[in-house]
Structures are given as C-alpha cells and as structure tokens.
Amino acid sequence: MAKHIVELTDALSNKIAAGEVVERPASVVKELVENAIDAGSTVIDILVEEAGLNKITIIDNGSGIEEEDVATAFLRHATSKIKNEADLFRVHTLGFRGEALPSIASVSHLEMETSTGEAKGTTISLEGGKIIEQKSGHARKGTQIEVSQLFFNTPARLKYLKSLPTELGNITDILNRLALAHPDISFRFSHNGKPLLQTNGNGELRQVIAAIYGVSIAKKSVPVKAESLDFKISGYAVLPEVNRSNRNYISTIINGRFIKNFALVKAIQEGYHTLLPIGRFPIIVLQIEMDPIIVDVNVHPAKLEVRLSKEKELGQLISQMIKETFHKLQLIPDGEISKKQKEDQKSEQIQMSFEENKPVKETPTLFSKPTIPEYVPSDEDAPREDDFILETMPSYEPESQAEQEEHTKERIPKMYPIGQMHATYIFAQNENGLYIIDQHAAQERIKYEFYREKIGEVSRELQELLVPIVLEFPADEYVRLEEQKAKLEEVGVFLENFGQNSFIIRAHPTWFPKDQEEEMLREIIDEALSAPSISIHKLREDTAIMMSCKKSIKANHYLTTQDMEALLDTLREASDPFTCPHGRPVIIQYSTYELEKMFKRVM
C-alpha cells in the first residue's frame, strides 16, 4: 500500500533547514553577525564560550526589531529584506532568505532582547523553536541574542563536530572575513573571556589586515584597484615574498559579502604567476563592487557560493590589475625576510595583533549586565614600537607616466659582480649594498621572456631541415597528438602524418637553437601530451617555462667575471627580473645599513 503524502510540521521543517544553515557553531555566529550588519550596526560584540558549544552571545547597536515583529522574525521565510521576486535579483543585504533565526532557534535555547530605541524593548525566549516567553522590558537601541545548548535536540549533529580548537578556528575565520569585508564596523570577539580580535571600525582596511594577520604583513601589503563598466575593485595585495602554503589567505568580497569562487581564485593566482614558488599562495584581500543584478547569491543557504554572469571579464580584470601593480614595484627581497618567513611558515596560522593606539568605538550597553569584561593589558601585552608603524607608513601614490616609463626601463639597479659562491650564486655590489643572485634562476627568467615572446609570435619564418625528423609514438599518444596538431602549430611544431603512428617534421621556427632541434621538438610535444586537454595559452606558457629551465645554466657551473657581468646586464633588461618562472627569487639584497647593523657598526 502506498504511503500517504503529508505536510511536514513547521518544527520539523525548521530542523531540516537547520541542517543546511546551521552546520556548526561558526554557522550560528555567521548568521547572527550578518543580521547585525544588515541592521546597520557600527559596533558588534561576539562572546563565545567553549567554541560556541556552551554559549554564543551577539550584541549590536543596530536598528533593533519592533515589538510586533519579534515573534514573526522566528517564522520560516519571514524577512524584512525582500518583498517580491524582483528584490531577489537585487539583494543588497547579507541575509534575505528568512531562514537563519528559525533554524538556529530550532536546535538551541535562544533568548533575544531588542529595541528600536523609540519604545520599550522586547525579550523573547525559545527552546527548540518553541516560544517559551515573550515580555516587554527596558533596553537600549540594538539587539542581543544569546544561543545556548546548541544541538541539544539533535545529538547526532554533535558527533560530527570537530575538536574545540578546530571549531574555534572556524568561528575565528568567519569573523576575520566579516571584519575584512566591513572595515567600517568595529568587531570585538572574545572566547571564554579572552579577547581574540578587535578592530577599530574606522574604515581603514589596512588596519583590519594588521589586526588579523599582524603589522608585519600589513607593512608588506600594497593597495590595488581597478575599474571597468561593470566592476570596481579595491583592496590590498601582499608582496609575493610573503606567501602561504594554502589558499586560506585569499579573501574575495563581493558587495560586502565574503564569497568562495574558484574562478576568481584562479584569476588571482594568474596575477601572481611566476612571482610565487610552486605550491605557495598569496595573501590578498579584494573588495569588489558590482550591480547586484549580475551576481546571484541565492545559490545555497550558506550564501558562500555565488554565480557571476560576467565571471570571465572579472577574472581578467583581477589578473591584469595584480600584474600591473607588481610590475611597477621593485620586488627584491631583503635578507631579513628569510627569518621572518621561516617563523611564519612554522605555524601557518593566522596571527592576531590588537592595536591600542586607536580609540575603539564605544560598545552600547544594552542591558544591566556588562557585555565584555574589561581587558587590562599586562606588561607583556603593552604595545610595541612596531604596533604603531602603520600610522606613519608611507602611502603608495600612483606614479606619473614618466616615472612608470623609467621604472619599466630599469627594474633593478646596476650591479658589479665580485665573485661566485659554490659555482651557483653570484655576489655583486653597488652603493646600495650587497646582492646575491641565483645564476640559474636569473638566466631562466631571461630565457623565459625570450621564449614566451617567440612562441607567442607564431612566426611563419621556418627553417627547412635538410634531413626531416621522423617521430614515432605509441598508438594512444599518436591519437592524442592528432587532436592537438592545430595547437602545436601555434607554438611552431608542424606535424605531418607519416606511416603508422608516426609523424614527420620538415621545418621548425628559425629561433630554435642550432643542433638541438629534435630535442626541442620532443620536449614541446611531451608538454602537449602531459595534460589531457590544454589551451593554446597554457601550452605556450608551459612550453616557454620548460624550455627556459632546460636551456639555462645550472648550479655548479663556474662563470668568469665577464660571464657574470653579461648575465647581470641582460637581467636588467628583463621586464620582471625578480623571480624565475617558477616563482623562486632571483635576487636577495642586504642593504649597507643592514650589514653595518650586523657588524654593530651602527646601533
């Protein structure tokens, strides 16, 4: 007998919705803080106990909720943020689905006190989504929500939570992203009474970066900006010399909403291409503004994923912006960076520093009990000199056209070789200090730019071979090369069918090195075979990188003084002489002042 179809109760529906909206304590924090942001808050306090499993309290000074709307706010799909279908495609707020409050309330004990500031406040208590009590009371403008006993009625959910440090890390990550997205809001986050994050809310994104990642990272960040008809981008990109082992430090924010988008991450990585070592990732924060109609945020209840109707155009704008920004800078790392980088890489954790030199916006006292316990810094917590450096850091001003042209002509100064170490590193000097150059990386960069230009030209000037080259392949590779023939022609390899599983090559580009033609052809073909599908752009790029690496001088290769001079002079003509195509540094500098400090000649 067929089972009857019945309508689910509201309580059960809310529990099902909670499975998508409220996965862990961090989900509760995210939804409630986003509500506070949408309410126009300028100060938000987040108090968490035992990684949110014991209690989560969010206090804001936003607009509050009218007394007659308080109970309605806990009904599923009840919201003040959209009214009709048209509003759904022009969402300006972080929340709009009306699912967060009922979903959170359905799996916890929840108490909310709220006031619009024009009348008495309202207090409401719920357990498992059921209203236990609602009463009027005195409260200042804003809202306080306290969530306790999370997942008390869904014990299976507790089994899938991670350790307390992991859950706390998830909460911290969410709040870091929200703080980066809203530098004009003061966030104060504490765990078990201990402050973990505090931002000033003064609108300075760089100050937020300092509070989250540390002053040393903020000092290494440079402003980026770009604009098109559809997009306006601003933010900060940290110099390539400071990088991380994962993508967690890439923050993309669209219309005030932190989002995850693989295509935009790829675009950012493309912008850093050849500037970062393989397997390393940048630290960057991008704030992107666009018309809400070209971004669909109604993809998933968590609202982390979005669909962009002009994703490719945005990606190209981001990549070009990053490339142009770094092309204007001299990216020679100093010798001291090695120690700092090593310390950073030991933990690979987000470091937080709290600046005491800026006044923090006053937090509203909504209720009789204190919000955050007063924090009195100890001597160890006293601000160091470095904590104030951001105040006096020089700002990056756009260069004039003449300055940009001069920069482009000479990216690195004239250097005079004084010797070679282990037949691998060139030591050079000038009035600015000492330079150490990786000879392989230096020539690799030079040859990469040469091959990239030659392969990109697709010149039809070919050198006929007196003796054509015949290449045989296994059947599977032969079939794949048949499909790739057009792409190979774009990089100068012209294959003609020649018997079973064979190709004949009768000519090659004139720039191929003499007596290395067959080796070059095989290496380019191997590059095409290395990936199941490859674009012409990537094939050209990978081929240029491969050829430059194989054709450059190696370590343990002795050079004469004339050889070193020629290499350094040619390197000065490169468009980006600071890293090899794999992102490793070409040059490291020790300034005269740094050397004098090391030898205690200056203090």
Swiss-Prot record:
GO cellular component labels: mismatch repair complex
A GO term for molecular function: mismatched DNA binding
Positions of region (Disordered): 337-383
Matches recorded under Pfam families: DNA_mis_repair, HATPase_c_3, MutL_C
Gene3D superfamilies reported for this sequence: 3.30.230.10, Histidine kinase-like ATPase, C-terminal domain (3.30.565.10), MutL, C-terminal domain, dimerisation subdomain (3.30.1540.20), MutL, C-terminal domain, regulatory subdomain (3.30.1370.100)
Transmembrane segments: none
SMART domains, per database record: DNA_mis_repair, MutL_C
UniProt cross-references to SUPFAM superfamilies, sorted A to Z: ATPase domain of HSP90 chaperone/DNA topoisomerase II/histidine kinase, DNA mismatch repair protein MutL, Ribosomal protein S5 domain 2-like
Keyword vocabulary terms for this entry: DNA damage, DNA repair
Superkingdom of this protein's organism: Bacteria
GO biological process: mismatch repair
Compositionally biased spans, kind Basic and acidic residues: 337-347
Function recorded in the entry: This protein is involved in the repair of mismatches in DNA. It is required for dam-dependent methyl-directed DNA mismatch repair. May act as a 'molecular matchmaker', a protein that promotes the formation of a stable complex between two or more DNA-binding proteins in an ATP-dependent manner without itself being part of a final effector complex.
PANTHER family named among the record's database cross-references: DNA MISMATCH REPAIR PROTEIN MLH, PMS, MUTL, DNA MISMATCH REPAIR PROTEIN MLH1
Family affiliation: Belongs to the DNA mismatch repair MutL/HexB family.
Name the UniProt record assigns to this protein: DNA mismatch repair protein MutL
Source organism: Listeria monocytogenes serotype 4b (strain F2365)
